[in-house]
Amino acid sequence: VRTGERRFSELLDRYGQDEVLGAIDDIMDQSERAARERTLSIPDGTYEAESFMDDDGVDIGKHIPIRVKVIVAGDRMTVDLSNVSKQVRGFYNSGPTTGYGASQVAFKCLTSPTDYPINDGSFRALEVINPPGRVVSAVRPAPMRSWMTIPMTVVDTIFKALAPAIPDRVIAGHFADLGNATMFGFVPDEGRMIITSTGPIGGGWGAKKTEDGVSATVCINDGDTHNSPVELMETKYPIVYE
């Protein structure tokens, strides 16, 4: 943060406030134009899809439906999450930002995944309807320990909804899980409790129309998380990997 503050101050000193803020606006406007142009290439219409999570860990065997509706009108897209499952008793709930974030990830992937930076302009053409009380917008006292599994499924379901309209630009669903294992225990000789996590484990991604999916890759909303080196885990904890 301090480095960013210093560099930004240097830009202001060098070019002046008006020039810097104007450049920022231009960058965001470029991202907006790119997103709108790609959205225009999607046929207007209402697209719907449904996925399921197995259960919430409490009501075993009771599926959690993830239903999305995507409305494309000109250069705008609306993602409606009103019919996603209501929040559940178990820990597969997520806060209100999750529905928005997952919709933004899907929108960015489908409109301008690599050619323009991610900023506010990237999402000006996107509206998200996310009423409270759902697994993507849970309210107190809903448990949220495994919140991160929900947005991956939402992204895949948005792709699924739009697959008939833009089959060349979507992939089939991926493994959509952190693959994370948390271990805890007591070390008698040292008199201490240990709690550790393996970090994200890669899995398989769905294929595109033109090529197979990638393997051993982290899930779509976990690109900023690093796994734990085996050597470090075996040194710090009474764990042996094979």
Question: What residue spans do the PLM features occupy?
Answer:
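Glycine/proline-enriched, intrinsically flexible loops and inter-domain linkers
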Residues: V1-E242
